[in-house]
Amino acid sequence: MKRTKSIHHASFRKSWSARHLTPVALAVTAVFMLAGCEKSDETVSLYQNADDCSAANPGKNAECTTAFNNALKEAERTAPKYATREDCVAEFGEGQCQQAPAQAGMAPENQAQAQSSGSFWMPLMAGYMMGRMMGGGAGFAQQPLFSSKNPASPAYGKYTDASGKNYGAAQPGRTMTVPKTAMAPKPATTTTVTRGGFGESVAKQSTMQRSATGTSNRSMGG
């Protein structure tokens, strides 16, 4: 009887341990997942031009100039394109638009349209995000940013990327943390945007960002 009792106790202890290890394992998994999420973020600085970057990074003039020029090229490739100057100005404000260089990401059929109508128009690059420089000046990336000076636009006074994602007030010199995906190259613009179309994208992205932030806060608060 004693041996049987001992066996039952051992079985009970094994069963109890198995049941109670599961939450611990889940907690450990959650910690590793959280660490993985943290590693997916990147600290970036926001600059208006190469001079701003050079002032903040003494001795890195060449790297700052390269990053700025690369951001300009990326802006030409990915910025929203408009069929007319008026459409662009309606979205971004007077003095904020320029003619898009030929072959700046547009599909051949749209290039033909541009040749017959004059040219496409795009917003000026208002600034750019730049990843923190690593040792030796390597390992940094850049992302062009746009901003509207039309109070009626959802992009008014904000820094947005080519997809319409909002990065807060259009104030250079700031440092912020963004997902690494924010620094990934955006798709080339292959079609024109209708008047107000980019502003709609900014509004939708802002709504999604607020919703995601609210969900995250509720989850953390229980």
Curated annotation (Swiss-Prot):
Highest taxon above the source species: Bacteria
Native species: Citrobacter koseri (strain ATCC BAA-895 / CDC 4225-83 / SGSC4696)
Low complexity composition bias: residue spans: 177-194
Family: Belongs to the UPF0441 family.
Name the record gives this protein: UPF0441 protein CKO_04429
Stretches for region Disordered: 177-222
TM region(s), chain numbering: none
Biased composition (Polar residues): 203-222
InterPro entries documented for this protein: Biofilm_formation_YgiB (IPR009576)
